[in-house]
């Protein structure tokens, strides 16, 4: 069954130039797992007949039932190239066998955190786009994530069989549709690409775009056709590739190439791509689907396709599958494209190192990553945890960036909040053993050198979700992943039977380990809260919790949305607060932060860990901050990295530095639970104006300063026109024209705003984009299907926080209702306390 042995793979791991780490990314239902199948089958794991139906990488039962991928799965493939193909590879290679580590990731928006984890450990991405639907919202999101991680894309345009069989398009229409899709992918690439990568746009004539059908198991690149024809006509292959795309035409009478679409007599000429590439495919489809028994053998002979005796009796789609698979096997086209155009770890780590590593780019760890050096000390990034077959244990799944990881080796396990020189979040433990991930199976190996993807056993109890393993004494962490979605939907979970409580607590711990983007915590009123990125994500998480992680029946509250508290103006007067012993005073004002700056902080462009001078320069140049203010940012909050700031604007205050720590921790506390209804603050800037402190150190300890700073922050906040913000989804809905009306009526009921509506050229489909408050999104999918007779498919991504215009302190308004309800739920007094509660008179 398996066509290659673990030893073969292991020996290839040492030739890092011949390794490719790649992930398959796409919009939901564009056929990632199906395409992955044809690759896996080439490596000899699925039997050929099953490919296209097995979806080997969908390992979970719910994935197979729903027909979607939820968790990303890794698999290693082995491939050999012919000598002449190897010569065309633009980077260093040894020999002609290649090892491809492939990660199939989910396309559904709610799981984009899984995609981020997959992208971190790979260097190249195969972007799958549906011919009929084209580039969708999720294609763009994932592609943007990939380019942000400096990952090189190649594209495959999938489901071409749909265009031929369902839409019955003409050759020229198909060419136009292809070229539109390629163009829209390139627009996204040029918008988000990093200069370091150089030109990573995709070009069919260079072989970085493949066309095919995952379901039928066939695909081709222009390079393959150029190969066939260059032998036949005796032309140079490079020249042939240029001619098979774009505006080049072949005149069969004069046997000349031209770039005009008419010949000398004014008769139309056929485009070379249509004539040489699409024509044989169209003819095969026509002959087989119209059951023309006499034409088929002639065509097959011309195309040198030999059928076995039992295959000759097939007809219709079954025959089509067999023939197309022999004519243009998908695996050949895709593997060739992956090997030729995606970078090896040696090439990629050279330009990815600075972006992966938190420390300076000249320290030994970073240099070892740059050189992908298997003999240096170990640097390994764990991007996620994968549950093992025995309950409660996890494999740490990650990639070796430098050094070699061995079974039984002692390593430093550094969690995300580790800083160099401190002991916090650091364990020194031995790795029990290393394994090779193979979709549904694992194979033990002794060691694994730099540039490869590996699973580790025995360190799951020291890492929460991600972290760095190293043997350097002074290594910084690998950078933490930025998720493009945030957990905004939460539910409270209770046990039905009080004796099961310890199991629930244990289960919640396991759940937060197994999913990179789920949050679990205990609220003040003692409820256990689980937060996810959307309805589907939460549903899957809770199902996992009930069935696997905790294994007990649960009571689940209706879903609740996370809000944020913010301010719209500057404080109308200076907020003053005295310490409990009346010897210290803090004076401050609150004011809003521009949305741009908040987004830059949330997206990691402005980073609390950056050098303060460099950060001040960026904030002054790009966001128009005053340089002295930007240099005096004391901290970000909550959690040390949120979009709220404390700026020190005091003049000549004695002992100021001694209270800095207390002020910072009080600010973290205040921004985590705002005064309106205990939600996090967002986009609030606190300016410290003056501080009077007692001369005696004992009278200005943390116990005096922290409550004071918190009260002052609340007072300043409530004096500055407080507002609340709700999370908003961007919804993209695809549907036929007659269903558009139904969509509008549902969106209007749900406070939705339509942003754009456009028809995809060449198809009857409309794409409607709209903003929909997360609060209204529950059951939206169901209502939409009802209103449109099941013809509309929504995709929702968290897009932004929108400020509610009404006053949250007035219980008669929309915002006020939300506040009162939330305060009841949290068990607080119904009325929001006024600023007077937190303000002290002189």
Swiss-Prot record:
Main localisation: cytoplasm
Organism: Eremothecium gossypii (strain ATCC 10895 / CBS 109.51 / FGSC 9923 / NRRL Y-1056) (Yeast)
Database matches in Pfam families: EFG_C, EFG_III, EFG_IV, GTP_EFTU, GTP_EFTU_D2
Annotated GO MF terms: GTP binding; GTPase activity; ribosome binding; translation elongation factor activity
Keyword set, alphabetical order: Cytoplasm, Elongation factor, GTP-binding, Hydrolase, Nucleotide-binding, Protein biosynthesis
Annotated protein name in UniProt: Elongation factor 2
Catalytic activity entry: GTP + H2O = GDP + phosphate + H(+)
Residues the entry annotates as binding GTP: 26-33, 158-161, 213-215
InterPro entries, A to Z: EFG_II (IPR041095), EFG_III/V (IPR035647), EFG_V-like (IPR000640), EFTu-like_2 (IPR004161), G_TR_CS (IPR031157), P-loop_NTPase (IPR027417), Ribosomal_Su5_D2-typ_SF (IPR020568), Ribsml_uS5_D2-typ_fold_subgr (IPR014721)
Annotated gene: EFT1
